Design a protein with these regions (language model features):
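Well-ordered beta-sheet/strand-loop patches within structured domains
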Residues: 1-401
Length: 401
């Protein structure tokens, strides 16, 4: 790479072409340049809109004139002169609606407390947010460059996306971990899909959620939830009434808790396995009602996806596994494992800026896990060189070479 760059007439272009940077990185980098230019034009920030009652179409107020200036500065409203700048007219309402969509807040065309807060997010804060996500993109560029086909789950956007030949071909809604049980950020290879899956309760969920319910009413709970207990040593099913539940504890519990296949299974009718130390997987769910919520932080860390059977068909990418074939397996009620022809990389990411929208208007997503701040602090921290453990003493200032 270095030799080729030196021989090239355009080193920067050569390196960019060689790296084949992901469109997200390039688009985010361009967005950063655009917002820095805006800051220069606007003297460092957008005009503020003062606090006050909710502004709606038909109202007149000096605050409306300030709202106009704010939306003109960020591009949702043109700067065409109007007879009465203090009148909240239909055109201004459309501009507010556009801003609300871009800011990922409730769309009603009125400027209440939530919209006012979003309007008064400083331009510098948006620049900082872009910088944070540009840094995140750098972390995974090498892995993305090594793959033509992959899945990206953006936790902050509650979406799962399938890429073929580095082009997004499909997207669906996702539910992610609660704010106190955050979905982790990592990469792993999807190996297989299980239809009509069982659910073996992970240790953390067993300790926090399931074991207390078993201790309270083991027979009733296992019956209601279609759960069986399996002895770790023998692999045989154990009658819950035969267990001394008073003595049971997370450290003294020699059983697996397994939920049988069925419509009430926590994993729904399909799970997508990419082995990892976090016990995280993609799966269907028996709580589909939450997909209509805007903020979808409902799981214990795994990723629940909408339209899982379409996802399975697209992931398998095999004419033998069409919709009818998948439905036929589901109808049997029997657990079936289907291996992918090739491992499919899965990237569980956390990006709070989306520059790759269909209309070209970037989206700034809420930092639901409160993760942006730590990265921004690190980016602005003074540079500090940490030598490796086996570095010569002179590198650490303890002598001379």
């Amino acid at each position: 790479l270095v030799a080729g760059a030196i021989a090239s007439d355009d080193i920067q272009q050569y390196i960019s072409d060689a790296l084949n940077l992901h469109p997200y990185y390039e688009s985010t980098k361009a967005l950063l340049a655009e917002y820095r230019q805006r800051a220069a034009v606007e003297g460092g920030g957008y005009p503020a809109v003062p606090a006050g009652p909710t502004l709606r179409k038909g109202m007149q107020s000096p605050r409306v004139a300030q709202l106009r200036k704010r939306l003109q500065a960020s591009g949702q409203l043109d700067d065409q002169a109007v007879d009465n700048p203090q009148l909240f007219d239909a055109k201004l309402e459309r501009a507010v609606t556009q801003f609300q969509r871009e800011a990922e807040i409730g769309v009603d065309g009125a400027v209440g407390a939530g919209t006012l807060a979003a309007l008064n997010v400083s331009l510098q804060s948006r620049i900082d947010q872009i910088r944070v996500n540009l840094e995140r993109a750098r972390w995974i560029l090498r892995d993305l460059q090594a793959s033509d086909d992959f899945v990206i789950v953006n936790i902050a956007d509650f979406t799962a996306m399938l890429y073929r030949d580095r082009e997004q071909v499909w997207e669906t809604r996702a539910q992610v971990g609660r704010t106190y049980r955050k979905s982790p950020i990592f990469t792993a290879d999807m190996k297989y899909i299980v239809f009509n899956p069982t659910w073996t309760v992970p240790p953390g969920i067993l300790k926090r959620d399931i074991l207390p319910k078993l201790k309270a009413d083991a027979v009733g709970y296992t019956t209601k939830q279609n759960i069986k207990l399996v002895d770790n040593k023998t692999g045989k099913e154990v009658d819950p009434s035969s267990i001394d539940w008073a003595a049971a504890s997370p450290r003294n519990f020699p059983y697996q808790v397994v939920q049988r296949p069925g419509p009430d299974n926590a994993l729904g009718q399909a799970k997508f396995i990419f082995p990892n130390p976090h016990y995280v997987l993609l799966h269907d769910t028996n709580h589909r009602e939450h997909f209509d919520d805007k903020v979808r932080t409902f799981s214990s860390g795994c990723i629940r996806i909408d339209y899982p059977m379409e996802f399975a068909r697209r992931v398998l990418d095999d004419p033998d596994w069409n919709d009818a074939a998948i439905q036929g397996v589901l109808d049997t009620g029997q657990t079936k494992t289907v291996y992918l022809n090739e491992p499919l990389p899965v990237f569980i990411l956390y990006w709070t800026v989306d520059p790759l929208t269909a209309d070209g208007v970037p989206r700034f997503l809420p930092d639901v896990y409160d993760r942006d701040g730590k990265i921004f602090t690190a980016l602005d921290a003074p540079f500090r060189f940490v030598p490796p453990d086996d570095a010569p003493a002179w590198i650490e200032g303890q002598g001379s070479p």
